[in-house]
Amino acid sequence: MITDPIADMIARINNAIKARKDEVSVPTSKIKEQLSEILKREGYIEDYVVSEENKKGNQGTLIIKLKYLGRRNTKPAISKIQRVSKPGLRKYVSVDEMPYVQKGLGIAILTTNKGIMTDSEARKQRLGGEIICYVW
């Protein structure tokens, strides 16, 4: 049993990038789909697909197509994804305390009472929340 499914997803993406894989599959959930949608919208992944068929029969699979840049598509669009708020130590910030990831070159993904969004969207709406991860 996985105690932190978001950390598992982040670890799988980081490992797939290091291994230069084209895609990675993770067990699906609503929050993982929302995280994938934000990564796609921000240009860090090419696409994602939810596959309902699974050998176990009860949970679908989320297939994330990773994005590579450069002349020969060798440089990954994601340098690193870092988990911030963990089940044992939650990290909450107000809108004034919200960090700039890599001096504005990365994004922070956080969950607010209005849903999951990036740090720039939360600043525009003047919302704080729990920081899920940093992406750069």
From Swiss-Prot:
GO molecular function, one term: rRNA binding
UniProt entry keywords in alphabetical sequence: Ribonucleoprotein, Ribosomal protein, RNA-binding, rRNA-binding
Swiss-Prot/TrEMBL GO biological process terms: translation
GO cellular component: ribonucleoprotein complex; ribosome
InterPro entries named in the record: Ribosomal_uS8, Ribosomal_uS8_CS, Ribosomal_uS8_sf
The organism's place on the tree of life at top rank: Bacteria
NCBIfam families: PRK00136.1
Assigned protein family: Belongs to the universal ribosomal protein uS8 family.
Function: One of the primary rRNA binding proteins, it binds directly to 16S rRNA central domain where it helps coordinate assembly of the platform of the 30S subunit.
Protein name stated in the entry: Small ribosomal subunit protein uS8
Taxonomic lineage of the native organism: Bacteria, Pseudomonadati, Aquificota, Aquificia, Aquificales
